Amino acid sequence: MDARELQDYLQAHIPLSAAMQVTVVAVEASGVTLAAPLAPNINHRDTVFGGSASAVAILAAWSLLHTRVRAEGVAARLVIQSNAMEYLLPIASDFTARSALAEPDQWPRFMRTFARMGRARLRVTAELQGDGHVAARLSGEFVALAMPTP
């Protein structure tokens, strides 16, 4: 799945991404990079609203799992189970979120567990950059669930 395909998917299936004007910058096995402008995500302090920052970080993390699972040829529902967001600096500009697997060496185990149990859990991180600085970090636990058979 390339950047255009992912962006089309997000806009069709996660309408909030379109409202926030999120664009897909890069899709790689090591991470997904998303970008969002300040204007539709602004708060009363003329910086990025914390909820927008969190949403873009979660979207980047979810997108990484989505693209990796699809590349494996597996159909799975992906949901976030829990997350922690650390806000380091206010963002007064357009911003990006770059996701990564917290422990890349756990991917084979994740896929084996999913194949055997029909569900598996994995931690994904995302780092937000704004104004040329790391502004926030997300750590999230995501769960892959087998799709029900008709």
Stretches found by the model and what they are:
Residues 1-15:
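Extreme N-terminal tail/first-helix region
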Residues 13-19, 72-77:
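Short secondary-structure junctions
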Residues 16-48:
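Catalytic strand-loop segment that frames the active site of acyl-thioester-processing enzymes
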Residues 18-22, 81-87, 109-111:
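Short structured motifs
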Residues 34, 81-83, 97, 122-124, ...:
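Hydrophobic residues positioned within well-ordered beta-strands of beta-sheet architectures
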Residues 37-62, 74-75:
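Hot-dog-fold acyl-thioester-processing enzymes
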Residues 64-104:
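Hydrophobic beta-strand-centered segment that forms part of the acyl-chain substrate-binding groove
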Residues 91-92, 102-150:
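HotDog/MaoC-like acyl-thioester-processing domains
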